Amino acid sequence: MTALREYNLIMRTLVELYDAEQMLNLIAATQLECDLVVFLYTADQKHLIHNEVIENLITAPTEYMEYSPASLESLLDQIEGDEIFIDVHGGDDLAISIVSAAAERNRYYICYSGMSTDQFYILHDGTTSMQKLKVPRLSVRQIVALYGGKVRNLPESYFDDYGRKAAEECLAEHRRSAKRWTAFAKAIASAGSSQKENTVWRADTKFYHDYENILENLPHVFDFCGIRDGRCELVFHDRAYQLLVTDIGVPFEYETYYQMVDSKAFDDVDLRVNIDWNGGDFVSGDPNSELDVVASLKGRLISISCKAGKYDQQAIYEVKANADKFGGITSVPVLCADIDMERPEYVEKANELNVLLIEHKEMKKKKAAQMILKWMETH
């Protein structure tokens, strides 16, 4: 068989019963390396076909045929190939019954992907064989596009190593004294618009004396911090660094992002991802979502919502909805919180929705990536 394949003497064709779960339309083609892929779709699936990600990743020629239960058998007879594999993931019970009968009669191969078992199954002549599942490694953008969304290109500031230290300093100070930090950040945020546009921030000397213990612990945030010309003067290293102070959620998002990146376990990791729900061009009125941290691994989307303070059950529902929308049934919804809520009902709700909840104790120990990987083994 292998020698014949090398000399192209056998034509291998994959027939894919189209599935609303787009990832499943891609896996069999990746697994089998066929010479032709034929997608069979129903009338109500027309809006799903010709997915750009699928067509870019499948190297074999592709064809599309619309079917109904009445026409399915005759369509199968028209398909060419010495070895015909039929992926039954997308068919309803009637379609699978028709395909199974045709497979027995014509000695077709029936195949399907076992995502939970990490196996690819092939049924032929009454026997079942298994292969290790080959799932294409996709970027965050590819997975989002696969499920109909589009990532918006935003001018995001990815801090360098110096900026990372600044973010870590801000988060550490907030963790030491959240109330003091809140008052400090509020004072910075209340500055006039002219100060917000510059790196230099000035206030009465009282501000410096009130918050000197915080300021001295932020050496990477400020290039200068002290009394000058009778006033308190703070010189931010960069305008973007002001956000690290005024919005504590930002340093916590970066902390989560860096934990994921540092693990080197994921195919792709991105930060503060803005997504157009319908794959459009972000025109006014288009539904969109911002995901705090997003990663991908073996074709699965990990959607992480970051909460630096208290959260409610709505936050759990929201991260679940976003993960399902942009990553399908294999997505991994995660809520990372820099607080231990000690609310058993929240834990129960997260478990009910299959949302991984990672709170302050684990985040401070930098266990986010480890816990996500362990979760993915059983979910």
What is each stretch, according to the model?
Residues 12-13, 36, 83-85, 300-302:
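Structural motif
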Residues 16-17, 59-72, 307-310, 361-362:
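Short beta->alpha junction loops
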Residues 18-23, 43-44, 90-93, 310-311, ...:
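Short beta->alpha connector loops
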Residues 23, 142-379:
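Intrinsically disordered, low-complexity Ser/Thr/Pro/Gly-rich regulatory segments
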Residues 24-31, 51-52, 74-75, 98-102, ...:
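A short acidic, amphipathic alpha-helical/loop segment
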